[in-house]
Amino acid sequence: MGNRALIIFTDGERVSPVVYLHWCGDQVPAWLNDLKQLMRGREGDVDYSCARFIGLCHTQIVGNLSLGVWNVPTPIERTVRAFPTTDRSREQLAAYGHGDAGVVIVNAHGLHLASLRRLPA
């Protein structure tokens, strides 16, 4: 069905749109390493981190499919802000994920993964 991932950037207050990857979920860690180089000096900038990540994805994904972006639904936005502090936030993100590579929450301060694991759908 794919190697899907949903990537969301946050600083604990602001939350980016969701970046959807259909085939490249396993590439997220490598692309985040590339993003760290691009974002030097702008650590913590949720909007630019998300935008530049989308740009990196765009250069790697051929055609007009397999890369999407949409607004985070309000309940998920609240959940992202609470993650990883509660079991409930993990459950809600698991239910929101599309399976495969799961939901990836990226801390915009230093672009570290707050979560990168398969979450059951």
Where in this protein do the model-derived segments appear?
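Short beta-strand scaffold segments in enzyme catalytic cores
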Residues: 4-9
